[in-house]
Amino acid sequence: MALDNATVLERLRAALPDAILGSAEFRGDLSVYVRPERIVDVARFLRDDPELRFNFLENLCGVDYLGREPRFEVVYHLISFTNRSRICLKVGVDEHNPSVPSLTGLWPGANYHERETFDMFGIIFTGHPCLERILMPEDWEGHPLRKDVPLGAEEVAFTFNQDRIYAHKPFAKE
């Protein structure tokens, strides 16, 4: 039977009251806002608590909220197959010191997710065993999923707009 969100939140707040900044529920899914320095403690508690048993890290990702403080957020989705329940943990990450502790010690599968988040957003996962780029070339400058990265794409030429686009190209015309 699925765990009630209120029960999960109550157990979490009772065990780690100083780690929780807030919570929200949307369409039946519980999100808990966690202090960055306490994410490992919260994740370990959710994994190891005999009643909760959120023992599967489904994924984690970065989000860029340009213009908001904190600018970045790392979002973790955990599943308890035993209790048929999910929980979302959200950690705010400062733009000027974009770091959060790594969860690879709890879930080795976090390795590639954290590397991708580092590569795309520049969020540093302290304690990660091999925090290197995973998608972009090693000599790539910047982090392409940040919202302040300039878009340098060219408009694609189709039959309806090719004359306008080709008029600005430096190649020879027939």
From Swiss-Prot:
<comment type="subunit">
    <text>NDH-1 is composed of 14 different subunits. Subunits NuoB, C, D, E, F, and G constitute the peripheral sector of the complex.</text>
</comment>
<comment type="function">
    <text>NDH-1 shuttles electrons from NADH, via FMN and iron-sulfur (Fe-S) centers, to quinones in the respiratory chain. The immediate electron acceptor for the enzyme in this species is believed to be ubiquinone. Couples the redox reaction to proton translocation (for every two electrons transferred, four hydrogen ions are translocated across the cytoplasmic membrane), and thus conserves the redox energy in a proton gradient.</text>
</comment>
<dbReference type="GO" id="GO:0050136">
    <property type="term" value="F:NADH:ubiquinone reductase (non-electrogenic) activity"/>
</dbReference>
<dbReference type="GO" id="GO:0005886">
    <property type="term" value="C:plasma membrane"/>
</dbReference>
<dbReference type="InterPro" id="IPR037232">
    <property type="entry name" value="NADH_quin_OxRdtase_su_C/D-like"/>
</dbReference>
<dbReference type="InterPro" id="IPR010218">
    <property type="entry name" value="NADH_DH_suC"/>
</dbReference>
<protein>
    <recommendedName>
        <fullName>NADH-quinone oxidoreductase subunit C</fullName>
        <ecNumber>7.1.1.-</ecNumber>
    </recommendedName>
</protein>
<keyword id="KW-0813">Transport</keyword>
<dbReference type="GO" id="GO:0008137">
    <property type="term" value="F:NADH dehydrogenase (ubiquinone) activity"/>
</dbReference>
<keyword id="KW-0874">Quinone</keyword>
<keyword id="KW-0520">NAD</keyword>
<dbReference type="GO" id="GO:0048038">
    <property type="term" value="F:quinone binding"/>
</dbReference>
<keyword id="KW-1278">Translocase</keyword>
<comment type="similarity">
    <text>Belongs to the complex I 30 kDa subunit family.</text>
</comment>
<dbReference type="Pfam" id="PF00329">
    <property type="entry name" value="Complex1_30kDa"/>
</dbReference>
<keyword id="KW-1003">Cell membrane</keyword>
<dbReference type="InterPro" id="IPR001268">
    <property type="entry name" value="NADH_UbQ_OxRdtase_30kDa_su"/>
</dbReference>
<keyword id="KW-0472">Membrane</keyword>
<keyword id="KW-0830">Ubiquinone</keyword>
